[in-house]
């Protein structure tokens, strides 16, 4: 089978979903901007050679409905010969898009693909139109569909205190702010136009969601968001609501060499896993272990991890059971995570993979893992290797 490589990976800045910079920008525009951007950054790629576009999106309705992958590609002016499909594995959608494209390339059904994902949570709320089957309650607790309560459950099972959660959330904002100041995000963010607080058109170059003013005292003052009586999970220790998109240019190793394109990372292995829906946030643990086994690697071989921070109460148990608590500051989410940057559902998978690859390049790391939890009890993971 063919080796699959990433030759470029980018994202939009992350905008706040409530009155943020992208409040007048549609999800298709966020997506089309990156599709065009990848081709502009890589002029040696003939767009007519692209086989397919795999684009993650969770809430596939309103402006995100009717195959947003194809709509965005047409909006971007890409050749009509390029196929496009929208992928939904909830929070893991755009990482699943990478997995789908990788398999097509591995078996020779494609040479070049674009993957990515988008979610405009300001325009299409997370729970818009959701109607769970009543019969699910026979086998799954109703609270399993309420992500905040699953985080409460997982945190309690692992003895995660409110203080630990607040400290983790503070660190996320501090690391993300430092990454912004130091320019660590510059190589992955493709600036695009949005609107400032006065409604004026402006070029957005940095993430709007990060709160550098965050303090432990401020976090400690927040009320529990999901379980008012006994809870420990607050808005401050949960992933922010944000709008954004991410994308990658993926191809066979042979094609990259033929075009003279730099190979930024190779897809070493991939995995998904299911887990108890009531502790959906634990999914990264079995998914990561499965991916490492397929790659013939151990946890000790991995130099950097990107773990999507759905909640601090969810992230810390995963970090603990992956044996990373003692090296968390050196190995996990060096630039912060979704608590600071937000979690635009369909965007996040390739977003964290993009950040991982950039951090691997910056630090000289050879092996890295991107992994995330998925609503209703799943996990997804990808092992990347730099040449």
Curated annotation (Swiss-Prot):
Keywords: Acyltransferase, Cytoplasm, Fatty acid metabolism, Lipid degradation, Lipid metabolism, Transferase. It is an enzyme of class 2 (transferase). NCBIfam families: AcCoA-C-Actrans, fadA, PRK08947.1. The active site is at residues 91, 343, 373. Belongs to the thiolase-like superfamily. Thiolase family. PROSITE patterns: THIOLASE_1 (PS00098), THIOLASE_2 (PS00737), THIOLASE_3 (PS00099). Transmembrane segments: none annotated. This is 3-ketoacyl-CoA thiolase. Its EC number is 2.3.1.16. CDD domains: thiolase. InterPro entries: FadA, Thiolase, Thiolase-like, Thiolase-like_sf_Thiolase, Thiolase_acyl_enz_int_AS, Thiolase_AS, Thiolase_C, Thiolase_CS.
